[in-house]
Amino acid sequence: MSENTFSDTTSIYNQNLSNQGFILANLENLVSWARTRSLWPMTFGLACCAIEMMQTAGSRYDMDRYGMLFRPSPRQADVMIVAGTLTNKMAPALRRVYDQMTEPKWVISMGSCANGGGYYHYSYSVVRGCDKIVPVDIYVPGCPPTPEALLYGILQLQKKINRTQQVKFKR
């Protein structure tokens, strides 16, 4: 009786599966899809670019539709958005926050000041680009960059994540 019940259940399952279809994907595509649609940024707002970053998270542009949810702790974040002028005094704090982030981690440099010093490039107290402190994946130009530019940078980061290998297999 138990064999008969098992075969009936299996045949019903197979009929339902053939009627609905199924999805074929490898683990690499699944992990890339999940990571690109659940980016959690850590805000590192240093100047006026941070205002534009906040506007991007508002209701008009709604970063949440891309799966982005700002996290208050670097241990919960996988993307750091450096927005604004990075001074020499703030550089060790930036590196410390970056080191506390979990792997894999990505950095978006937002604005002319974060990209290369911007208006304050020749000042003695300004780091001429946050890429001297942390590795940067995406540069968003502008002074200040518009929310659309930041969203475009986020979309470029998603494309970059899809292109890179996410799963490392041990042999």
Swiss-Prot record:
Its EC number is 7.1.1.-. It is an enzyme of class 7 (translocase). GO terms for biological process: aerobic respiration; electron transport coupled proton transport. Signal peptide: none annotated. Binds 1 [4Fe-4S] cluster. It is a peripheral membrane protein. Keywords: 4Fe-4S, Cell inner membrane, Cell membrane, Iron, Iron-sulfur, Membrane, Metal-binding, NAD, Quinone, Translocase, Transport, Ubiquinone. It comes from the Bacteria. NCBIfam families: nuoB_fam, PRK06411.1. This is NADH-quinone oxidoreductase subunit B. It comes from Orientia tsutsugamushi (strain Boryong) (Rickettsia tsutsugamushi). The gene is nuoB.
